[in-house]
Swiss-Prot record:
Annotated positions binding Mg(2+): 166
Localization in the cell: Cytoplasm
One of the Pfam families matching this protein, by short name: FMN_dh
Role noted for this protein: Involved in the biosynthesis of isoprenoids. Catalyzes the 1,3-allylic rearrangement of the homoallylic substrate isopentenyl (IPP) to its allylic isomer, dimethylallyl diphosphate (DMAPP).
GO cellular component labels: cytoplasm
Gene name of the record: fni
Name of this protein: Isopentenyl-diphosphate delta-isomerase
Organism encoding this protein: Pelodictyon phaeoclathratiforme (strain DSM 5477 / BU-1)
Record-listed FMN binding positions: 70-73, 101, 130, 197, 310-311
Organism placement in taxonomy: Bacteria, Pseudomonadati, Chlorobiota, Chlorobiia, Chlorobiales
Subunit structure: Homooctamer. Dimer of tetramers.
Keywords: Cytoplasm, Flavoprotein, FMN, Isomerase, Isoprene biosynthesis, Magnesium, Metal-binding, NADP
Protein family (similarity comment): Belongs to the IPP isomerase type 2 family.
The reaction(s) this protein catalyses: isopentenyl diphosphate = dimethylallyl diphosphate
Alphabetical list of NCBIfam families matching this protein: IPP_isom_2
Length: 357
């Protein structure tokens, strides 16, 4: 990659962080759907609060709590500091961490340290590498795969599906042909599990079925209700070119708020798994607008193995309260478990949610 192209990629990654922290990038008129549900109160919990156990497992490995610090950043100098602090928090709580897209690490060695720092400060927890669907569609070489995995000593590879983001991105790649074909090839030859995640538009049951058939081991629904990457890229576009001229004003609002709410994704994929018992080995991650331990708890009751968050934790990191925020979320989760009489995460997953009137 040329020096100019590297500079543009670095600028884009910096823009993403700045806009996510300070821009108006949440969905309008569309929520995660978690607010539609409530837990039934257990007047007789029959457990001690001190006995509540948040530990669980993900992809065969024990984790301290059903929470993942979701893919955010990497590939520019300032990202090393952000990733170090995220890694330190992940290690403290014993929870998984996903890095941002590693495309730039493949194209320029000078940016690899911003990713490698993660394993240095999180030596014992699950770390997930990350690459975009357009890169997968072109066919990753064995060298590229090895570079990503070895750089992090990764426990898995996340492939992110971001068609809507690429559509709005000024320099976006909208060629999504052969993604499934290449995913199947990748899943068959890679020595660690492949996870597939959206980035805020959600994964439907039909898409989940296709992904499972391609051999992925986990699906992160990353539904609508939190950050809209269309809005992030729209801000970048208008900064560069002024008024939006690509889409009609009549359609723009719906396109910017395009996506399936997170809770609906979980419900639909949960129904798919019930219809097809052979799919029960696939683990589901709930992300997209997760902003508290209550959201984590509802995610688990809706069928997720764990929940994940990016923007809320990034903002907490920016404000200097990352570990305090994670602690409060885990306390939220313990509170829900106590008030529903569930001592373990496995028990919480079997709780039935009440639909609010």
């Amino acid at each position: 990659m040329s020096e100019t192209a590297n500079s543009r990629t670095t600028e884009r990654k910096q823009d993403h962080i700045e806009i996510c922290l300070h821009g108006d990038v949440v969905f309008n008129g569309k929520t995660t759907g978690f607010e539609r549900f409530a837990f039934e109160h257990a007047a007789l919990p029959e457990i001690s609060f001190s006995d509540i156990d948040l530990s669980t497992s993900f992809l065969g490995k024990s984790i301290g709590a059903p929470l993942m610090i979701s893919s955010m950043t990497g590939g520019y100098s300032e990202a090393a500091t952000l990733n170090q602090r995220l890694a330190e928090a992940a290690e403290r709580f014993g929870i998984p961490l996903g890095v941002g897209s590693m495309r730039q690490a493949l194209e320029n060695r000078s940016y690899r340290e911003s990713f490698a720092v993660v394993r240095k400060y999180a030596p014992t927890v699950q770390i997930f590498a990350n690459i975009g669907a357009p890169e997968v569609a072109k066919g990753l070489t064995e060298s590229e795969i090895n570079t990503m995995l070895e750089l992090l000593r990764a426990d898995g590879l996340i492939v992110h599906l971001n068609a809507a983001q690429e559509l709005f991105q000024p320099e976006g790649n909208t060629d999504f042909r052969h993604v499934l074909e290449q995913l199947a090839l990748l899943s068959a030859k890679i020595p660690v599990p492949v996870l597939v995640k959206e980035v805020g538009c959600g994964i439907s049951a039909s898409a989940a079925r296709q992904l499972i058939a391609a051999g992925v081991k986990a699906i992160d629904v990353a539904g609508a209700g939190g950050i809209s990457w269309q809005k992030v890229e729209e801000i970048r576009y208008t900064r560069q070119f002024g008024q939006e001229r690509r889409f009609s004003l009549q359609a723009l609002d719906e396109l910017l708020n395009w996506g399936i709410p997170t809770a609906q994704c979980l419900i639909d994929i949960g129904a798919l798994k019930k219809e097809s018992p052979g799919l029960n080995g696939i683990e589901i991650v709930a992300s997209g607008g997760v902003g508290s331990g209550m959201d984590v708890a509802k995610s688990l009751a809706l069928g997720a193995q764990l929940a994940a968050s990016a923007r809320a934790l990034l903002k907490a990191l920016h404000d200097g309260v990352l570990e305090e925020t994670i602690t409060s979320w885990l306390n939220d989760l313990r509170a829900v478990m106590f008030l529903t009489g569930t001592a373990t995460i496995a028990e919480l997953r079997h709780k039935t949610l009440i639909t609010k009137p």
